[in-house]
Amino acid sequence: DEGCVTFEGLGKLGEDLGIDASSDTKLLVLCWRLGAEKPGCVSEEEWAKLGSEPSLPTCDKPVTLETLKAGWSTLDPAFLENSDFRPFFKFCFEFNREGTKKFLERDTALALLPICIEDRSKHTKTFLEFLETKPEDFKINRDQWCSFLDFSLNVGPAPDFLGWDADESSWPILLDEFVEFAMAKK
């Protein structure tokens, strides 16, 4: 895209910062705080917020690689409260979609989920194992993605899944299937 920092440009920024752009969550936090609206793209207008967005380490400073490096740790999502983390988690889905698609490919979700959710879920490892059993062309929609976060915050770990009620739940079917998968493993 013309006038847009794409995944390739973000990868280059990662190299310049000495980080792995494909696994450093702080890069996603940066894009989220810049207000990136298009999947895989930070516009020039959004990028210009580096010098003015109060939640960024470069606010009111000359925007240089050094100022960004110096404040990089402030972009750690571990500092986000749950009320801020939810919009960030949803952003991770939206930003990593391809174009106008309303879903993530299975392999994208497998790579992205552990980066985005980090240690906020006791279910991540088993959920990733579950997703790997799905066909390669399996897709995850936004409701399933966001519901996994809610599930993670509200349902206890396997094998008990305290807080889970299969008869009364309104979780997406994918999460019902996940619980069945996890219970069969025990």
Please give the residue ranges for each predicted region.
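Surface-exposed interaction/gating patches
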Residues: E81-D119
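Acidic Ca2+-chelating loop motifs
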Residues: D1-G11, L34-P54, K61, E98-A109, ...
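EF-hand-based Ca2+ sensing modules
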Residues: L13-S43, E53-F85, L112-E136, S152-W171
